[in-house]
UniProtKB/Swiss-Prot annotation:
Localization, UniProt: Secreted
Species for this entry: Rattus norvegicus (Rat)
InterPro entries in UniProt: P_trefoil_chordata (IPR017994), P_trefoil_CS (IPR017957), P_trefoil_dom (IPR000519), P_trefoil_dom_sf (IPR044913)
Protein name: Trefoil factor 1
Source taxonomy: Eukaryota, Metazoa, Chordata, Craniata, Vertebrata
Protein role: Stabilizer of the mucous gel overlying the gastrointestinal mucosa that provides a physical barrier against various noxious agents.
S-S pairs: 28-54, 38-53, 48-65
Modified residues (Pyrrolidone carboxylic acid): 22
Protein's gene: Tff1
Length: 81
């Protein structure tokens, strides 16, 4: 019985949190060789962010202004009870 209650509470919490989240998330944690250029030579961090892109000038030879990585939210697993 206690397991069922825990499962139900977990489901309610997941549903509440999922209503706040979208189907996709974006992150700037992109491997340098996988960056897709989003700027132009000499772009500033502010100009880059205004375009909705990520800025990281710590790695030479790769785009500093690049598109964020889109992560698809995984579907929730059903609670077996």
């Amino acid at each position: 019985m206690e397991h069922k209650v825990t499962c139900v509470l977990a489901m309610v919490l997941m549903l509440a949190l999922s209503s706040l989240a979208q189907n996709q998330e974006e992150t700037c944690a992109v491997i340098p060789r996988e960056r897709i250029n989003c700027g132009f030579p000499g772009v500033t961090a502010q100009q880059c962010k205004e375009k909705g892109c990520c800025f990281d000038d710590s790695v030479r030879g790769f785009p500093w202004c690049f598109r964020p990585l889109v992560i698809e939210n995984q579907q929730e697993e059903e609670c077996p009870f």
